[in-house]
Amino acid sequence: MSVSMLKSSPLHSASVASGLLKCFLGAHPLLPATYEKCGLTTSCRRSTTIHSPAKIWQPPSCRYFSKSRPILSPLPETSEQSSPSYLSTANKPPGTDEQGLKSDRGDINSDSKSTSKTSRSKKSNVPRSSKSTTQKREKPEKPRELEPWQIQKQALKKKFPEGWNPRKRLHPDTLDTIRHLHQQDPNIYSTPALAQEFKVSPEAIRRILKSKWQPTPEVAAERRERWEKRRKRIWNQLSEIGVRPHRPSFADVSDTKVLEKKRRTVGSK
């Protein structure tokens, strides 16, 4: 038995050395089945655990080169370098940073002041509930006293809803003619008919009919002279211009029959 052990000793030492080398290189040793029961496997495991931190350089395989990226590929630009803020800060001189900080502080202060002003203005705009305002609201507003001219204006509007025609100066003989026609036949020569005929307002006809005042013979003579002078003056002025004045149809009328004839002739035309 001793002879056989001696013969196998050099072979055993060579296999152990090769196994240790493979363990150091990181490859698992392919030990024969006879050494599985031996303690060499345990020693190899211990040696791998002890020497695992010290990695030995191994040449990469061809598959690594085929799958790996190209070595000279351009590196992606960082977001900081590409951002405009980074470029602006990089190009700025050193003194501008302090100025920017001061301006930022000034903006913050101005914003705070503006917010405080707006809050004050809102508070000032809020209506204050005071006793004076409540008393004013509770008291009913008294109607204003109208002036005399306002009262008269309202009365005229009520009396003449269609409007007020200004007074027209009529000849004294015309006033007598209006009264005479109305006395002859009030139904035919009514107030609207007389107003349409003499081109005055119905209110003026009513006043003429109601008035009972008659001038004295002396006043009537003076009035006729005055009106004759006025007529001549107007006639002369218009004749100088070259326009013949229109003489009204009722100037010399004193009878109702004449007016009736003229009305019939106008209606037939």
From Swiss-Prot:
What's the source species for this entry? Ajellomyces dermatitidis (strain ER-3 / ATCC MYA-2586) (Blastomyces dermatitidis)
**Do you know which InterPro entries this protein is assigned to?**
NGRN/Rrg9
**What is this protein called in UniProt?**
Required for respiratory growth protein 9, mitochondrial
Similarity comment: Belongs to the RRG9 family.
| The entry's keywords | Mitochondrion, Transit peptide
Amino acid composition bias (Polar residues), ranges on this chain = 76-91
Question: Transit peptide where, by residue?
Answer: 1-72
**GO CC entries:** mitochondrion; nucleus
Where it sits in the cell: the answer is: Mitochondrion
